[in-house]
């Protein structure tokens, strides 16, 4: 009880960055399979300004990506949640719940290490929701095509970060690598789920997928820098 009280009284820096759906004072440590009402460091202190800049860019864009993914699922559910899509709603909710965990973890890390989120969060808020809603208007196949395109882009981006950290100092970044690898695996699972639910059957699939992925790459590039 004392520990819970102390945790409840501790200022929660993540509220600066997180949407209302993310719970305060609740960090999810999925690597260890437990829910902890505490903050703990997954990053060592940066050795120099160059390392700090690298980590800031990495965390900023990861947070932006997970924020955007949450808004996409929100847009999809706003449309499909009112239709008779059957089991797909459970599938979307499962994937969205995982994205909420991802976002919550990056909220925690940004708050702890005083990393500024991208200034474009208001834009990604609107753009993500609009993308989710518009693709859902194409039907469940359109929503799944969006999922495939976005999750493929995010998993490739996470793979690039994993390579960078492995080449830099894997022992120094052990915990961060664990988190990114687990989140990468979730994104791959979402990608495969989209394919299993007829993503490729939407008219103009490859054109739609290409357009979405161009947007994702642009968002990644901009969010690292602004």
Regions found by a protein language model. Give the residues of each.
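Non-heme di-metal
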Residues: 2-226
């Amino acid at each position: 009880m004392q520990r819970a009280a102390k945790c409840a009284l501790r200022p929660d820096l993540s509220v600066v960055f997180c949407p209302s759906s993310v719970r305060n004072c609740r960090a999810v440590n999925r690597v260890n399979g437990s829910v902890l009402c505490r903050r703990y460091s997954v990053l060592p202190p940066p050795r120099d300004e160059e390392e700090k800049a690298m980590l800031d860019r990495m965390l900023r864009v990861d947070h932006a990506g997970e924020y955007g993914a949450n808004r996409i699922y929100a847009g999809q559910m706003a449309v499909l949640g009112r239709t008779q899509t059957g089991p797909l709603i459970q599938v979307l909710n499962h994937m969205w719940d995982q994205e909420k965990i991802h976002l919550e973890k990056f909220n925690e890390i940004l708050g702890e290490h005083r990393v500024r989120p991208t200034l474009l969060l208001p834009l990604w808020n609107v753009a993500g929701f609009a993308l989710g809603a518009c693709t859902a208007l194409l039907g469940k196949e359109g929503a799944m095509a969006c999922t495939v395109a976005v999750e493929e882009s995010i998993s490739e981006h996470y793979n690039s970060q994993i390579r960078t950290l492995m080449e830099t100092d894997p022992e120094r970044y052990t915990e961060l690598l664990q988190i990114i690898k687990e989140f990468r695996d979730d994104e791959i699972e979402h990608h495969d789920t989209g394919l299993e639910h007829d993503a490729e059957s939407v008219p103009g699939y490859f054109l739609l997928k290409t357009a979405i992925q161009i947007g994702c790459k642009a968002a990644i590039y901009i969010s690292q820098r602004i």
